[in-house]
Amino acid sequence: MRTPFTSKHFTVHVDPESQMEYAILSTHIAPIQQGFYFVNSGYSDDGRYLWFYCAYPPASGHFLGVIDFQTDEIHAYPETAGSGWMVDPKTGTVYWGCSQGIFQRTPHPNDSPKQIAPLPDFCRKAGVRGAGTHLTFTPDRREILADLQTPFGSSIGTFDVVSGAYHEWYRTVPGIPYNHAQMCPTNANVCMVAHEVSFDPKLGDYVLPAFVDGVYPRLQIIQRDGTRTMIPPYENFATHEWWASDGKSIYYCCHERIVRDWLDGRKPEIVCEVPIPGGNGTWHGHSTQDDRYFVMDGSYPCMGKDWWRGCESTVRFFNAETGKIVHLLTRNPVVNGWTPENPSIYHIDPHPRFVLHDTLITFTATTQGRVDLAIAKVDQLIRATR
């Protein structure tokens, strides 16, 4: 079976500063091709299938393509347009949400999409068009967690994979959206969501949420019975978050840091500090199953701002055993003529993530003058940070 480094569809590149290698998907089935959002892996556990995002400007949405490394073929599946894409690592089947509900599709071109759950009536009647930021399985893979965004609040709950029934765990009030729902990897009764923004009716726009009892309210833990616990973040700020593999703690980004919270009342623990003067040291991050290695993206100051959609970015690797860091990709340049006034309509942040049993990292690169899916080997990064 082929790999990204032996497939005819990939071209290997070397970062000119760090000398780290990565493979770019150079066969294009769409003008824009990206790695999955960092919460979910696009890989099947056997390494045969790799799903990726595709887009055709000016259309604002995405659909999926898939690489079959056994046949060395690429297939485009426009019918997967929607949101929340999640791959079952055991089978390579992809799940996603749209205005009709939750669907699944195998990687095989002769198969067709299958609906496994309709949206609840209260969502369909309200014109809800998606089923979550990124779907995640319960540990037993019998249910799928979703965050449903409705005019009357966010509904956090699970869909039964067999019956399609929806069980609501928690609902917010209108104007307080909870998104980025992620199931605990070890407990089917616990999930994490993000209070990322709030709607300001005076501005007619979404803004950062107001403090709640003096606490920045991004990090929220929700139980199946509807119990909600707010986690006070380090220095009262947090951005993108993810579960540790044992389900006993969470990680999140905080300016130039990755921070760990043990969810037991202990003070948050700083994992690493990786500042970028004038920019943002960490946007998104991810960790290996053994919590020894971390990867994160960040932004450089670009056209007078510290961040905008499509600005210059970087991907870095941190070795927690040695405390050393190396650039996997030193600089993603601006492409497609994007500017702060005319930013990308696509979420093209690198979104690095460990995949395939922590042997590879998938991310999004613009080093070839376009938006590309990129993949790197982890072992070279470990050697570079010993």
What is each stretch, according to the model?
Residues 1-23:
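Blade/loop signatures of beta-propeller domains
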Residues 26-34, 76-80, 117-129, 170-175, ...:
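Surface loop/turn motifs at the tips and blade-to-blade linkers of beta-strand repeat domains
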Residues 31-40, 59-102:
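Blade-loop segments of beta-propeller domains
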Residues 40-49, 84-93, 97, 129, ...:
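Blade-terminus and WD-like Trp-Asp/Gly-His loop motifs, strongest in beta-propeller folds
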Residues 78-154, 164-178:
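Asp-box/WD-like beta-propeller blade repeats and closely related beta-sheet repeat scaffolds
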Residues 255-258, 274-333:
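Loop/turn-rich, solvent-exposed surfaces of beta-rich toroidal or solenoidal domains
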Residues 346-386:
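Blade-level signature of beta-propeller repeat domains, shared across WD40, Kelch, NHL, RCC1
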